[in-house]
Curated annotation (Swiss-Prot):
Bias-annotated ranges (Basic and acidic residues): 195-206, 717-735
Compartments where found: Cytoplasm; Nucleus
PANTHER family to which the protein is assigned, alphabetical: G PATCH DOMAIN CONTAINING PROTEIN 2
Predominant location: cytoplasm
Pfam family, one: G-patch
Biological source species: Debaryomyces hansenii (strain ATCC 36239 / CBS 767 / BCRC 21394 / JCM 1990 / NBRC 0083 / IGC 2968)
Segments of skewed composition (Basic residues): 1-13, 799-808
Biased segments, Polar residues type: 43-52, 284-304
Designated gene of the protein: SQS1
Source organism superkingdom: Eukaryota
Biased composition (Acidic residues): 168-178, 207-226, 239-273, 411-423
Full protein name: Protein SQS1
Length: 808
């Protein structure tokens, strides 16, 4: 028999017994509630059940609101709305704000986007004003007048036939009538003033009509008041009603007459004033009508002088750039004669006109005629052809006639120059006038001096080239050109850019105007022919000399232009002047100049390296800061600096050997940072970046100390250390070995058969060993040993043996 409660029908349900066992799990006690709330069940995250009693929906009224029971946070809550999409933590918010501060907080107002929102309704205060006036009780007569004034001028004004007052309310009739009267009086004056301002109603009509309208309105108001009072009192009679009807009929007839008069006074002008249009649109007469080609009758000079009143007469009339020959008639009027069609035909076939023969008194050439005068001249010629009924097609005549002879050569030259300026090469345009000139920030480069030579140099201040923002250094022009081209300066704008940054430093070439004071100008053509003949003779002589030249070009004694050779290495390097025949002073001077040049070149290279090193330190570039090797203390220092630097999110270490990269990765883990190995081969390096754990936990300095006590030096694998660096850090091993051999060697030289130690001195009496032997009974010349058993008194002699012939 299975045990009771041993089988479970639903393993996911609460504990407290199986489905077929005890009934302890059926009831929800406090203990069971705690178990379900601990999160052990798989339904963790679902909303917890509540004990709120929900009434039946049928028992509620229609206007009762039932709130939703949900423990989830609404998506539209303030907490969710404060979060940006994709960033749920404060560190991510801070990083996002820091990265986009240039585009948000520091962005100038003129560069921020502007949003235009279209209004839902049209704002028209005048339309609202007219609506309010219409509701306030304006008579229909004036309302129609206002509508006609606001309508377009093409529509004719329509005046209603019957003016009837609109009563505002029935409760307060007396007050309403008084308000209507006051309003009508003010509206009449305003409307009449508007009409007079527009020029549509005369002053006389305004005065008469306004008085009539006011009287009629007052009479109507009085009659209405009387009728209303009679209605309230209940005193009405048949005779009075008939009389009132008769009065109303008379008033209507009078109102119709007033309306007819207003219609006659109100006129819309659709045609306009002809005189004003004539002044604004003058009709230009034809040029041919203004020019008369008929000659006046001849008159005597005395009559002309008498008519002129003694005034000076100039026969040449200058109009702009045109000079005309004039004549005066007997009436004192000046006339001129223009060329006929035949004369123009002769000009088109024979060429330009000889002005000196035709008009000797003219000061200017006919070629100075302007374009406007030339156009008028063509109109005149066309008029002459129409009047003369020439059997020549106008198109053919215009094509055959050379009208361009009137244009001056100077004007053509000016036009050519203007065209040349309009089609100027973009490279010649001043820098800063094209859109592509703003791709590079010119303020990054500053030049204060220029030095020309074999390699042009510029005294430049540039942080990326010199490594300093305040220091000027001499930089080759080629290096500067490569830099600006890489930063965005277009190649076709390079010349304009160089002229712009060196403006004021290079003297512009002054254009010399030749005065030909030293040049002989011949008055006849014979001298010119003689000069041409002499040039031909010189050219022939040069050709004959080259043909008769027997010696080749290589045999000519031309000094060489190759560089001087050097000899020696290192500090002993100097010029090789042995093959040159120079005196001693000249040799020493050349050698000194060469050494000064080498020292300047060496110091310049060192300054560049120092500037590059300082720039790398400022930008936290470890490749520049550690060119050859890193110490374990340097690695720990860089990690500590990177941890407290809020402006950097990542740091790249130089390429190290595999053990060095593992050491860097191990230290990054101790600092709670993320490490990534990048690159392959000799270019493999470790990239370290910060993450969330970096700010939540402290570094494990005990583990970092253990690593720092291991391998101390880590060399870069992408750079080879030079000999100077090895000697400065590790010492010169070759010299150290040579020094050790020199210390062990002796200056004495041995020969074949020499006795070893023959010249050695005797052991002194102060020697400790000799003192002990003397106390034991030893004396000088005796052998060592006890009595009866003493050794030899003479020591064994050792001789030097160098040869290999055997013993002798």
């Amino acid at each position: 028999m299975p045990k009771r409660g041993g089988r479970k029908s639903h393993p996911k349900k609460d504990k407290g017994g199986g489905g077929g066992g005890s009934n302890f799990g059926r009831f929800k006690t406090n203990k069971n509630k705690k178990k379900t709330g601990m999160g052990s069940s798989k339904n963790h995250g679902t909303p917890r059940s509540t004990n709120i009693d929900i009434p039946e929906l049928m028992d509620l009224d229609d206007n009762v609101y039932i709130p939703e029971i949900d423990t989830k946070v609404s998506q539209s809550s303030m907490k969710n709305l404060s979060r940006r999409p994709g960033r749920r933590h404060l560190y991510e918010e801070v990083g996002y704000t820091d990265k986009h501060i240039e585009d948000t907080l520091r962005q100038p107002l003129r560069n921020r986007p502007i949003e235009f929102v279209k209004a839902k309704q049209v704002y028209d205060p005048s339309a609202d004003l007219f609506k309010k006036l219409g509701k306030s009780g304006i008579p229909k007569v004036h309302q129609d007048l206002l509508d006609s004034m606001n309508s377009p001028p093409s529509q004719e004004a329509h005046v209603p036939e019957s003016p009837i007052l609109d009563i505002l309310s029935e409760e307060s009739e007396d007050d309403a009538i008084d308000e209507v009267v006051a309003h009508l009086a003010s509206s009449n004056t305003s409307l009449d003033s508007d009409l007079v301002g527009r020029g549509e109603i005369s002053k006389t009509n305004d005065e008469g009509e306004s008085d009539d309208v006011e009287e009629e309105i007052e009479e109507e108001v009085e009659d209405e008041n009387e009728s209303e009072h009679n209605e309230h009192r209940g005193i009405e009679s048949q005779t009075e009603s008939e009389q009132d009807e008769q009065d109303e009929q008379d008033e209507q007839d009078e109102a119709e007459e007033v309306e007819e008069e207003e219609e006659e006074a109100f006129i819309i002008d659709d045609t306009g004033d002809a005189e004003i249009l004539k002044d604004h649109n003058p009709v230009k007469p034809q040029t041919s009508l203004l020019i008369q080609s008929k000659l006046p009758k001849s008159s005597t000079q005395n009559d002309i002088d008498n008519i002129g009143g003694g005034l000076d007469y100039d026969p040449v009339l200058n109009i702009g750039k045109v000079s005309l020959q004039t004549k005066r008639d007997e009436n004192g009027q000046s006339t001129t004669e223009l060329m006929s069609v035949n004369q123009l035909n002769k000009i088109s076939t024979k060429g330009f006109i000889d002005e000196k023969k035709m008009l000797p008194n003219m000061e200017k050439n006919v070629s100075d005629i302007s374009d406007d005068d030339f156009g008028g001249y063509k109109d005149y010629i066309a008029q002459v052809m129409r009047d003369g009924k020439l059997e020549v097609d106008s198109d053919e005549y215009e094509s055959e006639t050379n009208f361009d002879i009137m244009a001056s050569s100077s004007d053509n030259d000016d036009d050519d120059e203007d065209n040349d300026e309009g089609e100027k090469d973009p490279s010649e345009i001043e820098y800063g006038f094209l859109p592509e000139d703003y791709e590079f920030d010119v303020s990054q480069v500053s030049i204060s001096n220029v030095r020309f030579g074999i390699n042009n140099q510029l005294y430049t201040k540039c942080a990326e080239l010199t490594g300093s923002d305040d220091q000027f250094l001499w930089i080759d022009e080629d290096d500067l050109v490569d830099y600006v081209l890489s930063k965005g300066v277009r190649e076709h704008r390079l010349n304009s850019f160089m002229k712009f940054i060196t403006k004021g430093l290079i003297d512009e070439e002054a254009i010399e105007v030749p005065n030909y004071s030293d040049v002989y100008i011949s008055e006849t053509s014979e001298d010119e022919e003689e000069g041409a003949n002499s040039e031909d003779e010189n050219l022939a002589a040069m050709i004959a000399f080259t043909k008769s030249q027997q010696q080749s070009f290589m045999d000519l004694d031309i000094p060489s232009t190759e560089r001087l050779k050097t000899k020696g290495k290192g500090k002993k390097k100097q010029l090789d002047l042995d093959r040159m025949q120079l005196d001693i002073d000249m040799r020493e001077s050349l050698q000194d100049q060469y050494q000064v040049h080498r020292q300047a070149k060496r110091s310049k290279k060192q300054r560049r390296e120092d500037a590059r090193y300082e720039g790398g330190i400022a930008k936290h570039d470890l490749l520049v800061k550690y060119p050859y090797s890193l110490h374990i203390k340097d690695i720990c220092y860089e990690f500590e600096t990177f941890l407290h630097d809020t402006s950097r999110d990542s740091m790249n270490f130089p390429p190290l050997d595999p053990h060095g990269n593992k050491t860097v990765i191990k230290i990054s883990n101790f600092y709670n940072m993320k490490s990534l190995k990048c690159g392959t081969g000799l270019k493999s390096f470790v990239k370290v970046s910060k993450n969330r754990k970096t700010f939540h936990y402290l570094p494990r300095y005990d583990q970092i100390g253990n690593v720092s006590r291991q391998r101390p030096i880590f060399n870069r694998i992408d750079q080879k250390r030079p000999k100077d660096e090895i000697t400065r850090s590790d010492g010169n091993s070759k010299k150290d070995r040579s020094r050790g051999r020199n210390k062990s060697e002796s200056s004495a030289q041995s020969r074949e058969g020499d006795i070893v130690g023959a010249s050695a001195p005797e052991i002194g009496t102060n020697n400790i060993g000799r003192k002990l032997l003397e106390k034991l009974g030893w004396s000088k010349g005796e052998g060592l040993g006890a009595h009866g058993n003493k050794g030899i008194s003479e020591p064994v002699v050792a001789k030097i043996k160098k040869s290999k012939t055997g013993l002798k």
